[in-house]
Amino acid sequence: MERAIIYYAKTGLEATDHFVPKLLEKYCQDNGYEIVAMLSEPASTEGVSFPMKYAIIGLNMEEDVNTIITLSKDMIGATDENVIDTLGKLSEYDIYVEDI
């Protein structure tokens, strides 16, 4: 069984912030992922914050996690440049992002 981190950005909308983590958990269960951590932070136009990237890399080193499950690339960054930059930094540590 592969081990994964769930990552999502909180929108401030109660229904959405409740529904998204449940959807991501179900996706992990249906696809054979063991959830090691569920991480979230307020939505930002920059995407994943530097402290969150640091936390994900730390979990990768301590928990042997190499997959991040998220709802869409928009949760990684608001622009293609932000997304590519984040994916590049994470891939240096053999961490890959899978969106549903």
Show which residues each predicted segment covers.
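Short, structured surface patches at the beginning of a domain
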Residues: 1-100
